[in-house]
Amino acid sequence: NKEAPKYDGRCRNLSEEEVEQKIKNGESYVIRQKIPQSCCVEVHDELRGKIVFKSNDLDDHVLIKSNGIPTYQFANIVDDHLMEISHVTRGDEWLSSFPKNALLYKSFGWQMPKYVHLPLILNKSGGKLSKRQGDVFVEDYRAKGYLPEAIVNFCALLGWHPKNDQEILSMDE
C-alpha cells in the first residue's frame, strides 16, 4: 500500500452537540478543513494549465493545531489574501496542497491569486538544492565565473522550453 497517510475521519461528522460535549470534557482538538467528498477539484496552474484532483484523494487537513496555533498552510493563505498577493510562485513539492488552497479560497469567498508550480532545482546528487549544502545564491555562481545571462537562461528554461527546442535565449527573449 503506497498511499500517503490520511486522516481517518473519525470526528468528521460529529454533531454540534457532540463537539460541544468533547470540548466541555476538556478533550484536545484541532480544526480541520472539511474537504467535499466524491467530486473533482479543478485548479489552474500558470505553467501546467488545468489540473484535476479527485477530492477523495485529499485529506481533511488541519487548519488550527491543538495548541490553537494556525498551521503554516492556513496562515499562508490568510496572509496572501490580506497582503493582496496576485501571483504565487512555488516549487512542485507544493502541488499536492494546491486543491486544498483553492477550496479554502472558495470557502472564504476570496479571489485566488494565480499560481505557478516550478520544478525544483536539484543538486549534484539529485536532492533538493539547499543552502545547507552549498551554493544556492546567484552570487555564488557569479563568483565561480557563471555569466548573469547564463544563470537567467538556465532559470528561464526550468520546466519549460520554446516549441522549437531552442536552448539559448537572449536577455530580451
Task: Enumerate the language-model features and the residues they cover.
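A conserved active-site cap/scaffold subdomain adjacent to cofactor or substrate pockets
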Residues: Q133, F137-E173
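Active-site cores that bind ATP or allylic diphosphates and position pyrophosphate for catalysis
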Residues: N1-K131, F137-D140, P162
